[in-house]
């Protein structure tokens, strides 16, 4: 494991008691580590864990960032499980009524949000530290990005308006691949041959990026969406709380993204036709008023 003691968690988060029993949080740490391994690769995670235990690291920034990400997510889950005491006689809440008070729901939500923000910031630092690491560049997920027309997190941010997040970009690689395949089929040819035309390339990037976000929103539950996308799907609940967007709001937003994608697909085709000297297709919206041809077809 990349974290092996309660004292490490304390140093990484600043909020965990170093004298807590490490075994109580060990299984949570392992599950979070496994989730991150699914993205960066299990071999890469094993190497980072070995470097952490050995004290000598080829990429110390990556080790530290990975430890912080695991620590913040694990402690958030640990705190959620321990808000209520689980005993033989049932679930109880133990509070010193003179000196303690139960937090409000909005306070718990704010604390969860703070942990999530630190978790995703640590993941972003991890991905930046791994971008130039040849060991990470050998992972299957990283190799898939070589065929993409949206090359990195900065490009994704510029095209869609989401916060620049290397972790979000890596999470979206499978959706970007599927979206690019759809765009290539609709366009009629591979997108690798359009890099010389700036306008056409931009239209293709817009279509791929918007389609990828729509795919991720449809295929993922709100709880599993990366924080960068969750901030898009949230609506202000007023007061000290923020409520998640309703299903109707989410569906409306996904429909809007799909319409935007089709707009940029049509723009790609128009630019291709202009370059080839082909006139744009025109569609008759209303029939011509012909005095000699007055009839209605049912």
Predicted regions and their residues:
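Conserved short "hinge" loops at termini or chain/domain junctions
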Residues: 1-68, 77-209, 215-298
